[in-house]
Amino acid sequence: MMFCGVDEAGRGSVMGPLVVGAVFVDNDQILMDIGVKDSKKLTPRMRERMYDQIVGSAEWTVVVASAKDIDDRRKQMSLNDVELYMFADAVNTRQVSRAYADCPDVNETAFSRKLGTLCPSAEIIAKHKADDSYPVVSAASIVAKVTRDRMLDDIREEFGVNIGSGYPSDHYTMDFIKEWIRVNGKAPEHVRCSWEPVRQMLSAKANTKLTDW
């Protein structure tokens, strides 16, 4: 029976989607032959090349949560739980005997147990830095990252300006959001308004207390 790897891209970003990728294989030798590794350790060109090889040789899926989806869900649950349910949605698209996941929670055991409850047919192995240890998780990381990068390219084209990487550490991203809020009085589409830096910008603009989130 197949097994799978699951990983995400965009968890900490302030702009753009959160993407969970899953790759399903009977044997991960083909992924090892491709040379997969954690997507963060690859250049964009290497990721694109490996992405094409992965999706051409293995079953795969992605689950996407937009910025608005994340804001809505964050009113009811933690980001870890948002990711938990997305992981489960990805795993449950196939019948698998085992699922390897890059654990977003500090508690690997608790996250494994929760994911196992949502994916009762699969043995769950959730580890920190699983994308370094399991080729199938590395492949899932690449699928998630390339999918998100392409979606962010579409967002850049939509706005027609440099929006950066979408992460709060990127001054292009934060300058774009700050200027948009200054001019329009609200955050641009594709921005996570539940993120603290954006809340602060909106509060400063409206001169109100942070009571909505």
Residue ranges and their predicted role:
Residues 1-213:
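RNase H-like, Mg2+-dependent phosphodiesterase core
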